[in-house]
C-alpha cells in the first residue's frame, strides 16, 4: 500500500489509508472593527462540524491584516463545506451561519474569497432580505455589496458568493500513551495545519471517531467502538486498540485540492511523529468502500 522504501522516522506510522470525499465549499473573508468581535463571529460561524449529519461544517483558515482586506479592517478567512451537491440546501445552511453568527455581531462584513469557482450563490434571497425590503447595494473596493440595515448600522455582504469543489474528510489518528499528549500534540498539529493556505481542521482535536454501522440508525454515525480504549477489556479480541495506547484523538482535514490536503497531512504528522508519548499514527477508513478517494499515509509522508 505504501512506498516500498519507508523512512525510519515513520516507523510508528501504520501502512494504511484514509478515505476522503468530494464536497463543495465557499471561502469567505469576514471583517470587523474589533478583534474580539471578529473572533467571536468567525468561531461561532464555524463551530459545529455538521457534514456527517447532513448539515454544513466550517473552519478558520487564518487571520488577515487590515492592509490586506477590501475595507481595510481586521479580517479572518473561513471555509464552509457541504458534502452534497444540493446547492439549495447548501445556500440555506450557509445563510443560517451568516445570519445567526455573523450578521448579529456589530460592524461585520462578508466578502467572497473563493478561488477557481464552479458557480456562485446570490446572497440576496436568504441573507440580503433580512433587511425586509429596506436593504440596498453599494460598492466596497469595487465589489457589489448588499447593505442590510440593522439597529447597530450596518451589516454588509458581497452579493455573489462563489463556491467550488474540494476534498473533505481526510484524517489521521495519533495514538497517545499519556493524557497530556492529546491536547499538547493536538495544538502543535493544528498550528502546523494553519500554516497551509486552503485547508481547515473542522473538528480541531476530535475525541470521537465514528463508524457508519450503528445499532441506532436514527442517530447517524456512532462511536467507533473497536478504537475506544475504555472498551478494550470488554471487547477482548474485537478491540483494535494497540498495547500502550490510552487515547486515540483524530484530526480531520478539508482542503481546496489534493495538493494542499496532502501537504497538511504531511506537515501535521511531521510536527508530532517524534514525540515519545505518541505510540502510533493511523487513519480511519471504511475498507475503501465509502469515500471518493483513498490516500495512503506512507505515500504522502514519503512523497511530500
Question: What would you call each of these model-derived segments?
Answer:
Residues 2-69, 80, 87, 92-250, ...:
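Conserved mixed alpha/beta catalytic, RNA-binding, or beta-rich assembly cores of soluble enzyme
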